[in-house]
């Protein structure tokens, strides 16, 4: 055994007793459907790959070690990672105690409770992770459709502390090249928003509306990223029960999208990063907060646009949230998504553009997404 393999073995990354396989040299859970493949990394729980079986492009091609050369940890954010117990920075005191930017969920080893198992219309896997500093436990159920390029994730967070606490939970899907390029289009039904660069205590001024942001006095269209990522983080709210976001890459012939209940995840946070004059990464982040600040600031601010910017979990309490992810093949002249409609078992994309009647439909099979009936 070479030195690298020995080190990984000592850290548990090559444990032969685990029901996982190696993907890019890392322990992973690989789920193989009839239409698509899904890969989850054990060293941080990130969804590192979601691709069609007959197409090599992986939209979630992101590694934090490439974005930040100082990031050398084996347990690190990749692809679509989970921000838990926070989104963004820690206080100086929390940093001294070892808490991470974006929380611990992508910095701990996850355990497989149930390896990928065929359950008829879908492949199911169960995973869990304990966050020792946060005092939280997260359990994840993944159902990959056998009949379409879609999967449903249900995550339960339990407060293991002796006291209740505030926390946040943000999904951080991150797209990268070659899927991400100058022709990649991001669409959403998001509405009212603000730039994270706007100063406290009223960062919600000035107000912007999707897909626009402001750079000085000039409007920026967030649908497309070219060579300038300023402003690099802009956050939005929703007026509909279902929130959705899509990223279309016509040159790659592929679209990735997410759909969720806006009562569970009321915020959409758009992160953009360009490098050497080209798009390098885009975060399509949906979650329980839209303010990229430590908890003392969140607690003082409380709400923005009448939406909460943190949530509370009592001792022993469990909270569950779901989302649906999907892939579509698209033509080279695709103009993006105007609207997404969803009924249990049926997902439809309506194309943008005047006079456009093209629709792309997907039967998600036995993957129901529970949408609450109350307004957000």
Task: Identify the function of each model-found stretch.
Residues 1-7:
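Sec-dependent signal peptide recognition
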Residues 156-161:
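Asparagine-centered strand-capping/turn motif at beta-strand->loop junctions
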Residues 7-21:
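Bacterial Sec-dependent signal peptides at the C-terminal "C-region" and cleavage site
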Residues 17-152, 163-376:
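Surface-exposed acidic/polar loop and edge beta-strand patches at domain peripheries
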């Amino acid at each position: 055994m070479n030195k690298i393999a020995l080190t990984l073995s000592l850290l548990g990354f090559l444990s032969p007793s685990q029901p996982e396989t190696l993907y890019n040299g890392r322990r992973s859970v690989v789920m193989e459907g009839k239409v698509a493949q899904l890969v989850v990394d054990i060293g941080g729980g990130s969804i590192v790959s979601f691709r069609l079986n007959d197409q090599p492009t992986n939209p979630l091609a992101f590694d934090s070690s490439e974005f930040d050369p100082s990031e050398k940890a084996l347990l690190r954010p990749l692809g679509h990672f989970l921000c838990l117990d926070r989104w963004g920075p820690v206080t100086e005191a929390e940093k001294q105690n070892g808490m991470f930017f974006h929380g611990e969920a992508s910095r701990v080893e996850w355990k497989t409770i149930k390896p990928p198992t065929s359950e008829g219309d879908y492949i199911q896997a169960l995973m869990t992770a304990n966050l020792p500093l946060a005092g939280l436990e997260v359990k994840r159920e993944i159902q990959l459709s056998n009949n379409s390029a879609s999967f449903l994730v249900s995550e339960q967070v339990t407060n293991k502390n002796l006291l209740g606490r505030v926390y946040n939970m943000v999904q951080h899907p991150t797209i990268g090249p070659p899927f991400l390029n100058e022709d990649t289009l991001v669409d959403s039904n998001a509405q009212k928003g603000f730039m994270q660069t706007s100063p406290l205590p009223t960062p919600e001024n000035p107000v912007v509306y999707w897909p626009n942001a402001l750079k000085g006095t000039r409007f920026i269209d967030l649908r497309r990223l070219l060579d300038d990522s300023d402003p690099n983080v802009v956050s939005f709210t929703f007026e509909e029960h279902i929130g959705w976001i899509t990223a279309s890459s016509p040159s790659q012939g592929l679209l990735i999208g997410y759909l969720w209940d806006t009562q569970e995840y009321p915020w959409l946070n758009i992160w953009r990063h360009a490098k050497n004059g080209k798009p390098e990464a885009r975060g399509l982040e949906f979650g329980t907060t839209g303010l990229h600040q430590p908890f003392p600031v969140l607690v003082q601010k409380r709400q923005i646009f009448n939406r909460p910017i943190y949530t509370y979990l009592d001792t022993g309490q469990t909270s569950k949230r779901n989302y649906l992810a999907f892939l579509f093949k698209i033509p080279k002249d695709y103009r993006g998504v105007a609207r997404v409609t969803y009924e249990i078992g049926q997902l439809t994309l309506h194309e943008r553009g005047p006079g456009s009647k093209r629709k792309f439909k997907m039967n998600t099979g036995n993957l129901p997404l529970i949408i609450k009936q109350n307004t957000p």
